[in-house]
Amino acid sequence: MKDPNSLPQDPMLAELVKMSRRKTLTRRTALAGAAGVGAALGLAACAPAGNNGTPSEALVPATDVSDSEKVLVWNNWPGYMDLSEDELSRPTLDRFQEESGISVEYLEEYNDNDDWYGVNRNELIAGKDVGADLVCPTEWLAARLVRDGQVQKLDIANMANHKNIAPAYLGAAYDANREYTVPYQGILGGIAYNKELYKELTGKDAPETVEDLWAPELNGRVVLLSEMRDSVGVIALAKGLDIASDSSFTEDAFNGVIDDIAGLYADSKIKAFAGNEYMDGFANDEYVAGIVWSGDVIQMNFSAGFEKYGFFLPASGGTISADVFTVPMGATHKKNAEALINYYYDPVNAAELAAWVNYITPVVGAYEEAIKLDPELAENKLIFPDEAFLASTHAFRALTAAEEQSFATAWGRVQLGA
């Protein structure tokens, strides 16, 4: 298997893997229910104006007291860190604290990009403390934070392992040299299904296309991610749209996909829009199939004790993105955060983390370490995808500030059934 970190670089993997063909319990808990959708609509209504240029110089970084305070507050997505077998410790994080002398308060309160931004918007705009020195937003939100000058520039001199960022993750339009953001894990969006229930209901072994989700036998048993870029992206790809291109995936094209999804929801083809709480729905057989994140499916099978669920990228393609490390402007322990980022860019630590979280590792050398750790793991294309696999993935194009607002509003209304 070819090491995925040797992939050629392509200018639109702004958000993860630009080579991916220019047609181009777990991590998340996204917007759930009317309250969450309301938060998204509220966020859209107050989305900041701006452009895709360089960060604003208006805000001044908080004074870094890392040399005198060996502490760090890291707010991450739920279930996005390795655990011991008894789930009482976090081996890689514990080792970092022992080796560095930095005490880490690890929070799992980053439940959704829109929700987190909405709650912390005023502090971000003012450059004040958001309750964490280090956060891991998804690329699209990170691009906004960089654009609006709300995160600090990192000191690469403090991160010797910065050189281990896989080439495919460099060149993002909003942060070409990864001076403000450093990839944490890559994310795939595709289709999952309960193998036994799907066959029992449809007579087929597995779905093959996005359209198979709308079979009448599955009415009321299909879930979509509440993360717009994944659900809309996968469905748009099935319609032959190039979600990486603003000339193909125009606002009119987006609205056409939104209308399709609204119709499917009204006809009960879609049961719900959810974040990773959909795992509970699959576990209790409420959901039979849906558009989900790949790493969650690996975790679901682990919890089930056998390969209960299948996951695939349809021939029309799946979505790809990344969550990134970044330091908010009001954080006071940037140097400590840089030490932690550097630690997780050691290939040994990256491989150990990947073995548990089951998302794509962006670290050069992690594949070779994974072979030593677990050869079977190293051959898992959902964690170490090869070039052929990535050719069927597509990065959702960057949106202007105006598009962010209109797209989020439309998506929120769909989830409300409006």
Regions found by a protein language model. Give the residues of each.
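N-terminal secretory signal peptides
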Residues: 1-25, 36-41
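Bacterial lipoprotein signal-peptidase II cleavage site
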Residues: 47-55
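Ligand-binding pocket segment of bilobal, Venus flytrap-like solute-binding proteins
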Residues: 221-227, 231, 235-239, 244-312
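Extracytoplasmic/periplasmic substrate-recognition and gating elements
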Residues: 292, 296, 302-356, 416-418
